[in-house]
Amino acid sequence: MTQPDIEIVIKEDFTYRECSDVANDVFKKTQWLLYVFLFIIFANCVVDVKYYFEGFSHSLLFVYFFLTLIILLVSFMGFHYLNSIPKPEAEPDYRKKQESKNQDFLKSQSNEPLEYASSSAVELEKEKNTREGLTILESS
């Protein structure tokens, strides 16, 4: 007997306030990355000028490539932080997915209705009254 395909998806829907808090945190990180980026660009320009006036040097070439690599890394991190901000109006992915085989399997095996009764006080009172009416009819 094969096991059913089980897929558990847990996704949290963010409220507007939670999204704005996350966005503020991300913008603070991105602002610091911008400061680091500008400092590295300035250092890269200093190395360029020194490299131009003093001539070829292996150590300056290494520093130049290292600074260029840091510039690329910092810019990638900035884009990553900005793209990681949750959007409250976005529809969660699990609502777009089709039902898995496991859900079809469970539907075919279940004898219970798919919709459950509401737990409101009015409906509970109606159920209680009908049960009491049935017990009175059965006893008489």
Curated annotation (Swiss-Prot):
Entry keywords, A to Z: Membrane, Transmembrane, Transmembrane helix
TM helices/strands, residue ranges: 33-53, 59-79
GO cellular component: membrane
Predominant subcellular localization, coarse grouping: membrane
Subcellular localization: Membrane
Disordered as annotated region, ranges: 89-140
Disulfide bonds: none
Record keyword Transmembrane helix present: yes
Feature: compositional bias, Polar residues: 105-121
Biased composition (Basic and acidic residues): 89-104
Membrane topology of the entry: Multi-pass membrane protein
Listed name of the protein: Putative uncharacterized membrane protein C622.04
Species assigned in the record: Schizosaccharomyces pombe (strain 972 / ATCC 24843) (Fission yeast)
